[in-house]
Amino acid sequence: MESKPSRIPRRISVQPSSSLSARMMSGSRGSSLNDTYHSRDSSFRLDSEYQSTSASASASPFQSAWYSESEITQGARSRSQNQQRDHDSKRPKLSCTNCTTSAGRNVGNGLNTLSDSSWRHSQVPRSSSMVLGSFGTDLMRERRDLERRTDSSISNLMDYSHRSGDFTTSSYVQDRVPSYSQGARPKENSMSTLQLNTSSTNHQLPSEHQTILSSRDSRNSLRSNFSSRESESSRSNTQPGFSYSSSRDEAPIISNSERVVSSQRPFQESSDNEGRRTTRRLLSRIASSMSSTFFSRRSSQDSLNTRSLNSENSYVSPRILTASQSRSNVPSASEVPDNRASEASQGFRFLRRRWGLSSLSHNHSSESDSENFNQESEGRNTGPWLSSSLRNRCTPLFSRRRREGRDESSRIPTSDTSSRSHIFRRESNEVVHLEAQNDPLGAAANRPQASAASSSATTGGSTSDSAQGGRNTGISGILPGSLFRFAVPPALGSNLTDNVMITVDIIPSGWNSADGKSDKTKSAPSRDPERLQKIKESLLLEDSEEEEGDLCRICQMAAASSSNLLIEPCKCTGSLQYVHQDCMKKWLQAKINSGSSLEAVTTCELCKEKLELNLEDFDIHELHRAHANEQAEYEFISSGLYLVVLLHLCEQSFSDMMGNTNEPSTRVRFINLARTLQAHMEDLETSEDDSEEDGDHNRTFDIA
């Protein structure tokens, strides 16, 4: 991830070197000190779990003010503003100086500061030298060792700030765990710290007399105590992660009393547990967001089929217990006693909300208790059936298979053939029959019979299928005169989702459930023979030629006038024997205009005999010759245009050659080109004469 340079929101506190400069600072910033000490957005919190942010500015080190929690309430704001000048010489300027660090891995285990304004609004500093370091288990051991050593120094700082009673702190405490959706970072076991890999720079501390709390070496950077140094030794390469400086007006105060406070171990363990919980919440939110973005209906269905078969070995199982399974106290493999699994399974709500009609199982427990289905044995015996994508592509194949297996799958004996039932079947080794009568009065009486039939159809010990019962009563009564048959893949078991392709075979009401065949007596009646006889007679009357007379084979009309009589042009007989004169003229003209040869025009297409035509004012040979001349002229014009273009190109090339050289060979080439064009024109004229005589209009142009 490419880091982007951004400015770190921080607070700069100035350390005056004398009381005069301190008064000038407090006088000029009288109103801003209250905002500095008591602003909500920039307040720090000294928490039981200290989180460090070792940051550096490449130009100059920045100092962030360090505050500890105290019992001062909000009313102390005005008191601190009024008394800040009086206690200027008594109040220690305790500040945290963040320097460029080369030992950031040890600094991350100690005092940790957390600014709610920078973390809450996701304004994490992204400078080019920032590296997000994640520490492993070896740093966890080092953290426990260093926490024992830093308790004394931390308590010393806390007591030192508490001794100055006028030092008012912010009463606003930031939230324990910021919201992950707003970009805040969790306080986890990974102990992510911000380490700036900048080169160590020379810093000259601004005060003449100051006390520096520095680490002795890079390993024990947080075992520190206050030591006084002179101003000439303040110029140094600051490699420790933090240096704590406090100054008074007159002389430095060296605090050597180290007080040991109670161990922070219980708070750390509770914070670790809270960190684990927050991590699981984050993972669950990520999973739920990924479900709406990356999961389609088909992929979620395939993942559901896979997870339902392999839920015994999975850490978090998305299988949902139905209401009937929880009512009959049947243990499921998806029940994990660990609290982590129960919390982490919340991330798979996208699988839980896709169950279509599972809520109906609570209302129909009386029907679903009598219907059993073993999902686990079905998954082990039959194995995964076919994926939904393959079933969607092979719908006709499976429909035919269901129709062939209708005899074996229907086992409900019914005494009354007029009773209308809805049977839901599964295409597997086990067949579940659920029957619901359309008659509301006879429904209660027929339920025990359907329950007995369904229990005899299933094999082995099984769990009750409440989702099927809910769907049974929901669909009964839609089409009372037909029978529904639902085919579901066995890999899903009782978990019937709305994604599953449900094929419905609508069978006529005359279907006999005992033998699985349609009733022959209730089939559609055959056609009336008298009606068929009438149809045949009407067709014969329409085809009679005696009443209508002779018809033209082109326009199917009789002779209308003496000028347009019916003729017999060829040896065709029957209904194709007669043709109108005008119809024949039009047909021959169309054949000539199509470019057919004279022989093709004068031959019948049906009997392949030569036409015998004695038409007035219609000469086939003359019409064909005229059309051939028109075609020749058109082709000559087209070829002439082609030759003109070719001649122009030749002249241009000749002028270019004449401009370049005056050799006799170029002149000879031009003369040969002119002769070639003249010969080509003569060939065109001779080809036109031949086409008029022979009727062949296919020419080839040979250009030398």
Curated annotation (Swiss-Prot):
Residue stretches of biased makeup (Polar residues): 66-83, 95-126, 189-212, 237-246, 254-270, 304-313, 319-332, 412-421
Molecular function, one GO term: ubiquitin protein ligase activity
Alphabetized UniProt keyword annotations: Acetylation, Cytoplasm, Metal-binding, Phosphoprotein, Transferase, Ubl conjugation pathway, Zinc, Zinc-finger
Bias type Basic and acidic residues, positions: 37-48
Modification N-acetylmethionine occurs at: 1
Chief place where the protein resides: cytoplasm
Zinc finger (RING-CH-type): 544-614
Modified residues (Phosphoserine): 317, 389, 687, 691
GO cellular component, one term: plasma membrane
Listed GO biological process terms: negative regulation of cilium assembly; negative regulation of DNA damage response, signal transduction by p53 class mediator; negative regulation of intrinsic apoptotic signaling pathway in response to DNA damage by p53 class mediator; negative regulation of proteasomal protein catabolic process; negative regulation of protein autoubiquitination; negative regulation of T cell proliferation; positive regulation of cell population proliferation; positive regulation of protein polyubiquitination
Modification sites for Phosphothreonine: 686
Compartment list: Cytoplasm
Record keyword Cytoplasm present: yes
Domain of life of the native organism: Eukaryota
Disordered: annotated segments: 1-126, 157-279, 294-313, 319-343, 361-425, 444-473, 683-704
Residue numbers binding Zn(2+) 1: 552, 555, 580, 583
Pathway as given in its UniProt record: Protein modification; protein ubiquitination
Function: E3 ubiquitin-protein ligase which may specifically enhance the E2 activity of HIP2. E3 ubiquitin ligases accept ubiquitin from an E2 ubiquitin-conjugating enzyme in the form of a thioester and then directly transfer the ubiquitin to targeted substrates. May be involved in T-cell proliferation by regulating LIF secretion. May play a role in lysosome homeostasis. Promotes 'Lys-6', 'Lys-11' and 'Lys-63'-linked mixed polyubiquitination on ATG14 leading to the inhibition of autophagy by impairing the interaction between ATG14 and STX7.
Protein name (database record): E3 ubiquitin-protein ligase MARCHF7
Gene (name only): MARCHF7
